[in-house]
């Protein structure tokens, strides 16, 4: 029961993250002007990351109860990555973006580095989520 709940949360997390990439982001940039898209993204990203943190933490707990070690380790790594994105990277990205808009030359390089780190963490989390499925189902079918 616990392992099934963890796998279900893993699927939910992958769905939430994928829908943001496939639906939300492209829609924002196609329908909103720069000012409104900036405001929307600054509002949505912390909430997205916190929601994903909640799901991944619950996933970790269910994997812990099921004694699925791989899921536990990966689940906690994913949870930590969302905390890093929410409380470390996002505020700095926003600050560098604001400085860029005022003409601060050095801030563009820093913005790109921080944004790249944020996207990389997000995509690595998705890879880790898929790896949980692979490990779980390969164990299941090898029994």
Which residue ranges define each predicted feature?
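Polytopic transmembrane helical bundles with strong interfacial aromatic enrichment
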Residues: 1-143
């Amino acid at each position: 029961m616990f392992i099934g709940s963890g796998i279900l949360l893993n699927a939910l997390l992958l769905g939430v993250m994928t829908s943001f990439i496939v639906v939300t982001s492209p829609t924002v940039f196609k329908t909103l002007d720069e000012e409104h898209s900036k405001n929307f993204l600054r509002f949505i990203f912390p909430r997205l990351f916190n929601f994903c943190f909640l799901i991944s933490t619950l996933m970790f707990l269910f994997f812990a109860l099921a004694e699925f070690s791989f899921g536990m380790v990966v689940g906690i790594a994913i949870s930590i990555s969302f905390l890093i994105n929410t409380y470390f990277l996002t505020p700095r990205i926003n600050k560098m973006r604001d400085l860029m808009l005022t003409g601060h030359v050095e801030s563009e390089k820093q913005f790109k580095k921080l944004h790249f780190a944020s996207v990389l963490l997000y995509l690595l989390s998705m890879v880790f989520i898929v790896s949980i499925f692979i490990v779980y189902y390969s164990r299941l079918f090898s029994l």
